[in-house]
């Protein structure tokens, strides 16, 4: 059986990367929440 997680750095960054987050209003809200929480990493790419 094929596993469901087939890693790809490109797909990962395009959907969850910093620039993808900054591109939409809701994405910026995600970053703001993570900053407020004090996350060391705001997104997978940065």
UniProtKB/Swiss-Prot annotation:
GO molecular function: structural constituent of ribosome
Gene Ontology process terms (BP): translation
Entry keyword Ribonucleoprotein: yes
Pfam families reported for this sequence: Ribosomal_L34 (PF00468)
InterPro entries, per database record: Ribosomal_bL34, Ribosomal_bL34_CS
Keywords: Ribonucleoprotein, Ribosomal protein
PROSITE patterns: RIBOSOMAL_L34
Gene Ontology CC annotation, any one: ribosome
Family indicated by similarity: Belongs to the bacterial ribosomal protein bL34 family.
Record-given protein name: Large ribosomal subunit protein bL34
Name of the gene encoding the protein in the UniProt record: rpmH
């Amino acid at each position: 059986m094929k596993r469901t997680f087939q890693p790809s750095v490109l797909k990962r960054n395009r959907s969850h990367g910093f620039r993808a987050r900054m591109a939409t209003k809701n994405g910026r809200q995600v970053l703001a929440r993570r900053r407020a929480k004090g996350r060391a990493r705001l997104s997978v790419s940065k």
